[in-house]
């Protein structure tokens, strides 16, 4: 009787596994279809607004211009001709975050006649420490629109067009041609490749900036005869688990302000023909020591897939598929573990409430652990997991294969990396991560638990 029950259980289990696999396959197909429809919808929504109307061509400065821009007009290498070039120029800024805000602010203030602002996101409180065009009163509205409001307060003569939708392979080729210089102020790899390929195909200078923690980088791609493009330097995108954005790694607001202001300066230099443009070189900023380094980077790659004389890429592709990550700076949820190696926060909460013996490892850095932590969590930074220094510390718990170990992090990504590594050493142990991490805990278990 017991054997029959066991056989029935296995048969039912196999049926459920097959059903789950079928549903997952159907879900994946629907997800792909949804993505295609969303891209098409974005394209249709953008068609009526992407084209920059014919610009007014100015031949002289007004009295207001002379008064407003007098401090740069008297620069010997800039003068009236430089100001006229700025007044007749159009610059596209992709991303109105920590980099895009200062860049837009300085370009509008300097008298750039036309600005395009691209950002799909809305203002939220966590933006305000570094995204200086936005305010508390504008939380919840489009970042592009919020930036437009602030910029027109600075300079009402600047013509500003907002694109409050995600830049993609469809609308990029409609938006970008109308602009003279493109600023990459995004915070994700997929958009970097998208902008690079579009600018290379359309022969538009691309001023690229990045900032993370206390470090920043700046260069100009697709400029001049021998200037490299982004693909010349990075032909292959990094694996998703190796990518850290400011939402995960943090950033000091003054660092993004520094790099964003320098992006504006490089754009002005390109437009005016001022000084030596930062092409073929990269500026590296170390905020912790306040040091700048200027290093030479490789020239145009003869066999580059997009900017060589015989390119393999002549149109835009699916960059989320190419990079294996989303074209935004939101949570990029990794999928490194099998479902049975994960536990949802509700099930873990029940287990913890029932006081069942277990070990909860929090793999966030100590600075994040200090902000908040789950009850009974032990802080073991991911680096200590990866170098196996945790083994001796928890030798007693690891002796028993039955003693359950759970791993948690902020969003459920680092915890997967930790579990994956621990399972290589202890394959028979019960080691699982808390799915979606502390963000899920706040959402599903305790809404008063801090989220950051």
Curated annotation (Swiss-Prot):
Pathway: tRNA modification; 5-methoxycarbonylmethyl-2-thiouridine-tRNA biosynthesis; Cofactor biosynthesis; molybdopterin biosynthesis. Its EC number is 2.7.7.80, 2.8.1.11. Residues 354-450 form the Rhodanese domain. Signal peptide: none annotated. One of its GO terms (molecular function) is ATP binding. One of its GO terms (biological process) is tRNA wobble position uridine thiolation. In the N-terminal section; belongs to the HesA/MoeB/ThiF family. UBA4 subfamily. This is Adenylyltransferase and sulfurtransferase MOCS3. It comes from Drosophila mojavensis (Fruit fly).
